[in-house]
């Protein structure tokens, strides 16, 4: 489009060229009048407001003669009359009159065109109404947007849509660059937030619309769609016509959401004719301008003097128009103070284009245009709109918007949006001194009165039936009919667990969902579930699929599933036999090393306690044969806590207490393991789970129509020649009993139902996939989200479990067998080594203390023993000493204490006699 517009521009220049006069030379460096052009339609809301603001700004700049060094600022207004042709003509005329900058044009489409002229003649062009997001400074370096780009407006709308939880919107817009590119930006912003524009309604320009027929046609289309969130990004006249016809079509009632861009707030602020009843409940946005004394004074001035008793009110674009003039004035002032000139010259490129009726040299090139542009984009000032400053990418600093709700002829501000802080209920400037926090918990808006007068946030969509019922595909199964089946003698009545869950979830929805069930399959064999799911994607056969549909990756790429209503996964089932037929089953709880270690510790602990008790406890003394029997009886009777011998020593009691705790743990574990072995059936199949199933060569059964076949061939690399299709539980049982298959791989719910009737089989190993069953809907279907919420509600209230128990909890088997299968794990030493270690350390510590005391007493008693046993020779052999020590150890502790006491008494007597002898020898004779 831009290249074609350039050709249009060139043709206008050629037509105009014959009437242009040759310029006499460059202007003076500091002319008495500094000219700024402005291109607006004075018969439009924006143009009329801008014209008043321009005059006010011009008056204020010129009120101080020294501001521009004695020069006066003059705004040259060109009335484009909403005509692209006149906009081009006005720009060309300005280029003849040595303007330093141009304010405008009013529309983005003309901004695209005239920016090429500004680039060539280096004349800065500033606009506060042409806010097309695609007007890039890289492509148009001399075009500057002095108000926030519509990119931020669309970002604000996208965050509002996300905040209220909507996912689909409809966009209404005029067929021009600004509206079209704004909607494109909205689509991009929504996509980043996992939302989308489901329909774009393009309307002609408002200058073209002569009757509301096209608007009515689009609104009727929208009324028949699911989405009820409508964004209106149009010109004011078109927007007012849209709301008028929407009211007539009943589209301003409860359930609808209308979001109008800044055009609606501008209409309200400008006091233009508008039936506010037509926009009751509508949300709109307004460029946010902080409250300030300067702004309040200007508003009062506008009301009293500037509008010349006209009805036009001050809208936010009047503030931006005023600030735009000041941006140019300050930039010119900076340029002049820096010693710059304001000079104009002929463009060499245009001068080379000569002909008999062609003279383009009258178009002046602004020599200091690049310098002035640089000063413009580096402007920092406080204006009516707040702080004025540009980012390096030339976007305005801290773009923000007021969010307005129109209620009963009143403007109710529900919050703000800022690119810095997001949605808030306090002015965004209060956040600028803090670190940005865009988390969802910090996004807030006040309550809204929506169309229809409700304060409840609309769902944003409705169930679209278009006069027909929702067509729901259900598998016409030949087996496992407890999940879904045809009612006998009926062509469209369905029953089963899956159907009851679906119907219960539908009842929880806040809106009716008329539906009908349509069978898929012949009822003789189970249908292919992948084909059934594919039917949803076309929208021709089914609008949804209900049944035992596994949620697998391949299917999630083409449809949306609800929250799973039952857990599932592939399992292996194989034949079983009872382990309690083995007479030696009581030995299986422990491994052989465990039995050996346990028996050894019984003996070790018994021996340790005998050593600790032997010298002080008569029950542990006597002939060797009796003592051995005592040790064995005592230690093994601790297994049943029935030992009759009492322990006397402190060390013995400590060891016994620790050992009894260990025995308690061991016996409890043995009892539990033996109970499991005697009650749980064990598989006689060599297949322990999916790993041994893969490595074996046996044949594997699977259910016809299940995804298990593709999973085993594609994911587990099992040869298809090993797979055997089976159609019913009866075929499952026959194939397993006859050895046709070594095992069957199927989903857990089917196997649980199968095992409730066939008790000679059990699940082998654990589930090797994790998935669930859900209901399938087309991609991005809002009904899938609401049904997921309903299923969660069923789960929380316990209703889902009640439905499960009603259909799937029956069992004809006397004992559970499917929940856990395979050989029970035997208990080994590794499970108890910590306790054995504690017992061993306790025994060693106790024996160490015991022998330390014995050796100490033996050392004290040794001389006495030697005298009494008449062994006076100091050359006694080591064997003799050992025999003496063993005799001491075997001796009862009471005798040792008695002997030590007698020894101490003898020592006292000898000491007394010695003292008496020494005393007698000292007496005189």
Curated annotation (Swiss-Prot):
Residues annotated as glycosylated: 309, 341, 359, 419, 437, 488, 738, 812
Region annotated Disordered, chain positions: 897-925
Cytoplasmic compartment segments: 613-621, 643-653, 853-925
Tissue: Expressed predominantly in roots. Firt detected in the vascular tissues of the cotyledons, and later in the vasculature of all organs. In leaves, preferentially expressed in guard cells.
Membrane spanning stretches: 592-612, 622-642, 654-674, 832-852
Compositionally biased intervals (Polar residues): 908-919
GO molecular function, a single term: ligand-gated monoatomic ion channel activity
Pfam families: ANF_receptor (PF01094), Lig_chan (PF00060), SBP_bac_3 (PF00497)
Position of the signal peptide: 1-25
Taxonomic lineage: Eukaryota, Viridiplantae, Streptophyta, Embryophyta, Tracheophyta
Subunit structure: May form heteromers.
Gene Ontology CC: plasma membrane
Protein name as it appears in the record: Glutamate receptor 3.1
Biological process (GO), any one: cellular response to amino acid stimulus
């Amino acid at each position: 489009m831009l290249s074609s517009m350039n050709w249009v521009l060139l043709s206008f220049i050629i037509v105009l060229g014959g009437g242009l006069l040759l310029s006499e030379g460059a202007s003076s460096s500091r002319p008495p009048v500094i000219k700024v052009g402005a291109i607006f339609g004075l018969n439009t809301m924006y143009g009329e407001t801008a014209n008043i603001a321009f005059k006010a700004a011009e008056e204020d700049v010129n009120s101080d003669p020294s501001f521009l060094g004695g020069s006066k600022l003059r705004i040259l207004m060109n009335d484009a009359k909403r005509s692209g042709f006149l906009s081009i003509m006005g720009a060309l005329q300005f280029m003849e009159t040595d303007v330093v900058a141009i304010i405008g044009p009013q529309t983005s489409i003309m901004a695209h065109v005239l920016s090429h002229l500004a680039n060539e003649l280096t004349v800065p062009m500033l606009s506060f109404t042409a806010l097309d997001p695609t007007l890039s400074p890289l492509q148009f370096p001399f075009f500057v947007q002095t108000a926030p780009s519509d990119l931020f407006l669309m970002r604000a709308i996208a965050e509002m849509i996300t905040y209220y939880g909507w996912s689909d919107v409809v966009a209404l817009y005029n067929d021009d660059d600004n509206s079209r590119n704004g909607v494109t930006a909205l689509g991009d912003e929504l996509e980043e937030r996992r939302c989308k524009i489901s329909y774009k309604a393009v309307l002609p320009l408002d200058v073209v619309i002569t009757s509301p027929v096209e608007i009515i046609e689009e609104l009727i289309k929208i009324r028949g769609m699911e989405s009820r969130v409508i964004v209106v990004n149009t010109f004011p006249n078109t927007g007012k016509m849209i709301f008028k016809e929407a009211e007539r079509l009943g589209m301003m009632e409860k359930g609808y959401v209308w979001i109008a861009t800044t055009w609606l707030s501008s209409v309200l602020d400008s006091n233009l004719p508008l039936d506010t009843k037509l926009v009751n409940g509508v949300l709109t946005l307004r460029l946010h301008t902080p409250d300030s004394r300067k702004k309040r004074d200007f508003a009062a001035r506008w009301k009293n003097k500037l509008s010349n008793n006209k009805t036009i009110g001050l809208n936010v674009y009047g503030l931006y128009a005023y600030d735009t003039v000041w941006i140019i004035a300050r930039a010119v002032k900076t340029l002049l103070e820096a010693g710059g000139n304001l000079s104009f010259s002929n463009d060499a490129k245009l001068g080379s284009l000569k002909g008999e009726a062609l003279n383009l040299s009258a178009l002046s090139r602004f020599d200091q245009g690049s310098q002035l542009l640089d000063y413009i984009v580096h402007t920092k000032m406080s204006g009516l709109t707040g702080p004025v400053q540009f980012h390096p990418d030339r976007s305005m600093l801290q773009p923000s918007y007021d969010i307005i709700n129109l209620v009963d002829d009143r403007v109710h501000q529900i919050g703000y949006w800022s690119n810095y802080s997001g949605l808030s209920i306090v002015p965004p400037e209060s956040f600028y001194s803090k670190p940005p926090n865009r988390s969802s918990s910090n996004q807030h808006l006040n309550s809204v009165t929506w169309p229809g007068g409700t304060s409840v946030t609309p769902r944003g969509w409705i169930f679209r039936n278009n006069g027909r019922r929702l067509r729901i595909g259900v598998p016409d199964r030949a087996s496992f009919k407890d999940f879904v089946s045809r009612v006998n003698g009926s062509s469209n009545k369905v029953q089963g667990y899956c159907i009851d869950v679906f119907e219960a979830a539908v009842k929880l929805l806040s809106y009716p969902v008329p539906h009908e069930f349509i069978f898929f399959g012949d009822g003789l064999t189970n249908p292919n579930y992948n084909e059934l799911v594919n039917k949803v994607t076309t929208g021709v056969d089914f609008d949804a699929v209900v049944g035992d549909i596994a949620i697998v990756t391949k299917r999630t790429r083409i449809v949306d599933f609800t929250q799973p209503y039952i857990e599932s996964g592939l399992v292996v089932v194989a034949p079983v036999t009872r382990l309690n037929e083995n007479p030696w089953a009581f030995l299986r709880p422990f491994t052989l090393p465990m039995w050996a270690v346990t028996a050894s510790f019984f003996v070790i602990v018994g021996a340790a306690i005998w050593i600790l008790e032997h010298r002080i406890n008569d029950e542990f003394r006597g002939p060797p044969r009796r003592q051995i029997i005592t040790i064995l009886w005592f230690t093994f009777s601790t297994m049943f806590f029935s030992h009759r011998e009492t322990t006397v020593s402190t060390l013995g009691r400590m060891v016994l207490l620790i050992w009894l705790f260990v025995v308690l743990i061991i016996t409890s574990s043995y009892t539990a393991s033996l109970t499991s072995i005697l009650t749980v059936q064990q598989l006689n199949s060599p297949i322990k789970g999916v790993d041994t199933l893969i490595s074996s060569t046996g044949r594997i059964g699977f259910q016809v129509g299940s995804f298990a076949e593709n999973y085993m061939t594609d994911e587990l690399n099992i040869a298809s020649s090993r797979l055997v299709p089976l159609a019913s539980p009866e075929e499952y049982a026959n194939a397993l009993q006859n050895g046709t298959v070594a095992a069957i791989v199927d989903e857990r719910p089917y196997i649980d139902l199968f095992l409730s009737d066939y008790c000679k089989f059990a699940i082998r190993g654990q589930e090797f996939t994790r998935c669930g069953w859900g209901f399938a809907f087309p991609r991005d279907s809002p009904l899938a989200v609401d049904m997921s919420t309903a299923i969660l509600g069923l789960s929380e209230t316990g209703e889902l479990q009640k439905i499960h128990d009603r259909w799937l909890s029956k069992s004809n088997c006397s004992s559970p067998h499917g929940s856990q299968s395979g050989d029970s794990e035997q208990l080994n030493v590794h499970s108890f080594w910590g306790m054995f270690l504690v017992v061993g350390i306790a025994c060693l510590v106790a024996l160490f203390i015991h022998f330390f005391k014995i050796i100490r007493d033996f050392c004290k008693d040794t001389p006495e023993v030697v005298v009494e046993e008449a062994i006076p020779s100091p050359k006694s052999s080591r064997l003799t000493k050992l025999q003496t020590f063993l005799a001491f150890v075997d001796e009862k502790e009471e005798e040792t204490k008695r002997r030590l006491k007698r020894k101490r008494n003898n020592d006292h007597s000898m000491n007394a006699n010695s003292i008496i002898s020494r005393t007698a020898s000292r007496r005189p004779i």
